[in-house]
Amino acid sequence: MLSVAARSGPFAPVLSAKSRGVXXXXXXXXXXXXXXTPEPPVLDPKRPILSRESLSGQAARRPLVASVGLNVPASVRYSHTDIKVPDFSDYRRSEVLDKTKSSRESSDARKVFSYMVTATTAVGVTYAAKSIVTQFISSMSASADVLAMSKIEIKLSDIPEGKNMAFKWRGKPLFVRHRTQKEIEQEAAVELSQLRDPQHDLDRVKKPEWMILIGVCTHLGCVPIANAGDFGGYYCPCHGSHYDASGRIRKGPAPLNLEVPTYEFLSDDMVVVG
């Protein structure tokens, strides 16, 4: 301040030098800042510091070798104590919940219950399988209209004695022959040793006067001609097979007799074939 008054020139006599002490807040701020300084952290010497060096020191430095012996463990097992293993108590029966109690006392009752459940399940599955198989097989069977067409009713009074009438049955010719008494006696007297396909006449008819046959030659499937041939029965014009009045092969290349279908007499005047 004195230096400023000396350099002021003409204003020097007017100016006077004075000094006054002013309290500054810088010291207080410095003291407050010094009091708030935290102390350096103290490390726990017992707790290891995780670093690259400490972790590498715990790793294996040599190849792992498995040793087996009487007093040497064959493997190393690490136990995880933080895993909670369930005891399945919710799924166990009340008889086996007590660990201190033997389960042999209730084993018979538990076995009987298991057997009953198994048997009931097996019966149910079997019944369901039966229903499924029955429905599947019934779906493959012929319908009612097809079964109705598979049978044919024939009025026998429309066929005179000694005549043969042909019908269509299941797409095949059906022969119904009203035989005379002479034809019945003649066919019954034929020796079986003379036949290529031995079969007695009475085994091929239900009533001797009615002969019902499928009119398809057993050689290659041609339709024979009735009341023709060397034996007065049926003759196949394709390859010359001769059948008698009972439909049995007597001559020619046919190996078997004419087929006899399934039929039933509803009355003396009505027969159902099929």
Swiss-Prot record:
[2Fe-2S] cluster binds at residues 217, 219, 236, 239, 241. Proteolytic processing is necessary for the correct insertion of UQCRFS1 in the complex III dimer. Several fragments are generated during UQCRFS1 insertion, most probably due to the endogenous matrix-processing peptidase (MPP) activity of the 2 core protein subunits UQCRC1/QCR1 and UQCRC2/QCR2, which are homologous to the 2 mitochondrial-processing peptidase (MPP) subunits beta-MPP and alpha-MPP respectively. The action of the protease is also necessary for the clearance of the UQCRFS1 fragments. One of its GO terms (biological process) is respiratory electron transport chain. GO terms for molecular function: 2 iron, 2 sulfur cluster binding; metal ion binding; ubiquinol-cytochrome-c reductase activity. It is found in: Mitochondrion inner membrane. It is a single-pass membrane protein. It comes from the Eukaryota. CDD domains: Rieske_cytochrome_bc1. Its cofactor is [2Fe-2S] cluster. It holds the Pfam family Ubiq-Cytc-red_N. The keyword Metal-binding applies. It catalyses: a quinol + 2 Fe(III)-[cytochrome c](out) = a quinone + 2 Fe(II)-[cytochrome c](out) + 2 H(+)(out). Its EC number is 7.1.1.8. Residues 187-272 form the Rieske domain. Its main location: mitochondrion. Keywords: 2Fe-2S, Disulfide bond, Electron transport, Iron, Iron-sulfur, Membrane, Metal-binding, Mitochondrion, Mitochondrion inner membrane, Respiratory chain, Transit peptide, Translocase, Transmembrane, Transmembrane helix, Transport. GO terms for cellular component: mitochondrial inner membrane; mitochondrion. Residues 29-49 are annotated as: Disordered. Gene3D superfamilies: Cytochrome Bc1 Complex, Chain I (2.10.210.10), Rieske [2Fe-2S] iron-sulphur domain (2.102.10.10), Ubiquinol cytochrome reductase, transmembrane domain (1.20.5.270). Binds 1 [2Fe-2S] cluster per subunit. Fe-S cluster delivery to the Rieske protein is mediated by components of the iron sulfur (Fe-S) cluster assembly machinery that reside in the mitochondrial matrix (including HSC20 and LYRM7). Residues 79-103 are mitochondrial matrix. The Rieske protein is a high potential 2Fe-2S protein. Belongs to the Rieske iron-sulfur protein family. This is Cytochrome b-c1 complex subunit Rieske, mitochondrial.
